[in-house]
């Protein structure tokens, strides 16, 4: 008996594996530090806005996310007509792949880039090409060397997940200048709100002055709206027009839309979250380093911790040890980092418990 057969390449895709979401045992407090979620939750104003429209769930949302695009435009000084919103930036990444990639094409991502990139690329029959990183950081020269006549798109997370590293804006501009004009450069700025470096830009200036670059962003991180699935993209009008032609007509719900408007306007909530993250990121990097473990310098809301390969001291051993204490971090074998764990910067209590736990783990307790 025959059955439907997936398109070529679909079954070659490794399914995305999210961070663990454990079910707490009775009487045990669990800290989920595996998905880069904010410990503060959404702005109270976003929750209030969500509730205000919750009595009208029978109505379809406004199909173009106009009120949200206008709020984003006001915040960043952008033309709302050059903005598109989606059910998380993941949806937008997939829409870009469907719009600009096909059988026989190639897209480039870096060694430890976000796993959605190869999934989106391979789902449309294109080939994902890996450009090697240097010190867990994007190497512009390696990307440029990977370009072939088949290259149609480059994915660049800046800052990168799961490494937490970034490249300066001058390097991003050098990358754009070195790419053929027909190659679309996608700048994924999901974690840009946490960066305080003077040489960093999320990429809006580059998008505004070119016809072949877009920048995507999300409300899942500093805004704390991951459950609502909201993202957006700023790009040239011709790219926005093309992507809109295949975008679902009601892809952002009304409650999500209004919660996002309130969230982006609550700058005090964002500033508080950014300052807390920076303080505890520095503290965690220093304290974990004192234990003899290497931490990759991060500009995001997480840190990447590297473990020895000695029996009893591995990342798997540490993961099991911490999980027993209700501390859930992210194992990274599927990112090609089998000896590392990624830790979301959590509450003060969670952060201190992780350091205490790692101290006991390294001491063999």
UniProtKB/Swiss-Prot annotation:
<dbReference type="InterPro" id="IPR004839">
    <property type="entry name" value="Aminotransferase_I/II_large"/>
</dbReference>
<keyword id="KW-0808">Transferase</keyword>
<protein>
    <recommendedName>
        <fullName>Histidinol-phosphate aminotransferase 2</fullName>
        <ecNumber>2.6.1.9</ecNumber>
    </recommendedName>
</protein>
<keyword id="KW-0028">Amino-acid biosynthesis</keyword>
<comment type="subunit">
    <text>Homodimer.</text>
</comment>
<dbReference type="InterPro" id="IPR005861">
    <property type="entry name" value="HisP_aminotrans"/>
</dbReference>
<dbReference type="Pfam" id="PF00155">
    <property type="entry name" value="Aminotran_1_2"/>
</dbReference>
<dbReference type="GO" id="GO:0030170">
    <property type="term" value="F:pyridoxal phosphate binding"/>
</dbReference>
<keyword id="KW-0032">Aminotransferase</keyword>
<comment type="pathway">
    <text>Amino-acid biosynthesis; L-histidine biosynthesis; L-histidine from 5-phospho-alpha-D-ribose 1-diphosphate: step 7/9.</text>
</comment>
<keyword id="KW-0368">Histidine biosynthesis</keyword>
<dbReference type="InterPro" id="IPR015422">
    <property type="entry name" value="PyrdxlP-dep_Trfase_small"/>
</dbReference>
<dbReference type="GO" id="GO:0000105">
    <property type="term" value="P:L-histidine biosynthetic process"/>
</dbReference>
<dbReference type="InterPro" id="IPR050106">
    <property type="entry name" value="HistidinolP_aminotransfase"/>
</dbReference>
<comment type="similarity">
    <text>Belongs to the class-II pyridoxal-phosphate-dependent aminotransferase family. Histidinol-phosphate aminotransferase subfamily.</text>
</comment>
<dbReference type="InterPro" id="IPR015421">
    <property type="entry name" value="PyrdxlP-dep_Trfase_major"/>
</dbReference>
<dbReference type="InterPro" id="IPR015424">
    <property type="entry name" value="PyrdxlP-dep_Trfase"/>
</dbReference>
<feature type="modified residue" description="N6-(pyridoxal phosphate)lysine">
    <location>
        <position position="221"/>
    </location>
</feature>
<keyword id="KW-0663">Pyridoxal phosphate</keyword>
<dbReference type="GO" id="GO:0004400">
    <property type="term" value="F:histidinol-phosphate transaminase activity"/>
</dbReference>
């Amino acid at each position: 008996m025959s059955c439907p057969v997936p398109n070529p390449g679909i079954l070659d895709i490794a399914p995305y594996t999210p961070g663990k979401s454990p079910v707490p045992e009775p009487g045990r407090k669990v800290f989920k530090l595996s998905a880069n979620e904010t410990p503060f939750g959404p702005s109270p104003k976003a929750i209030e806005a969500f509730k205000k429209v919750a009595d009208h769930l029978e109505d379809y949302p406004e199909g173009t996310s106009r009120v949200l695009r206008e709020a984003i435009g006001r915040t960043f000084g952008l033309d709302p007509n050059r903005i598109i919103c989606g059910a998380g930036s993941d949806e937008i990444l997939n829409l870009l792949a469907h719009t600009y990639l096909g059988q026989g094409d190639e897209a480039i991502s870096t060694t430890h880039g976000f796993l959605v990139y190869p999934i989106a690329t391979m789902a449309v029959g294109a080939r994902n090409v890996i450009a090697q990183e240097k010190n867990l950081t994007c190497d512009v020269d390696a990307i440029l060397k990977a370009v072939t006549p088949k290259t149609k798109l480059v994915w660049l997370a800046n800052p990168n997940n799961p490494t937490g590293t970034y490249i300066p804006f001058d390097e991003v501009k050098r990358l754009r200048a070195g790419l053929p004009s027909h190659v679309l450069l996608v700048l994924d700025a999901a974690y840009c709100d946490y960066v305080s470096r003077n040489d960093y830009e999320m990429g809006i200036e580059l998008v505004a002055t070119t016809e072949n670059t877009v920048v995507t962003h999300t409300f899942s991180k500093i805004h704390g709206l991951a459950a609502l699935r909201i993202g957006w993209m700023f790009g040239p009008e011709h790219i926005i027009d093309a992507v809109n032609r295949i975008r679902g007509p009601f892809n952002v719900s009304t409650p999500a839309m209004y919660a996002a408007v309130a969230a982006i306007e609550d700058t005090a909530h964002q500033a508080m979250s950014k300052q807390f993250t920076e303080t505890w990121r520095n503290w965690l990097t220093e304290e974990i380093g004192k234990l003899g473990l290497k931490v990759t310098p991060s500009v995001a809301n997480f840190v990447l911790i590297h473990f020895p390969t000695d029996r009893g001291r591995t990342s798997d051993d540490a993961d099991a040890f911490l999980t027993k204490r209700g501390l859930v971090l992210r194992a990274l074998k599927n990112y090609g980092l089998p000896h590392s764990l990624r830790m979301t910067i959590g509450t003060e209590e969670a952060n201190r418990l992780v350091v205490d736990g790692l101290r006991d783990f390294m001491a063999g307790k």
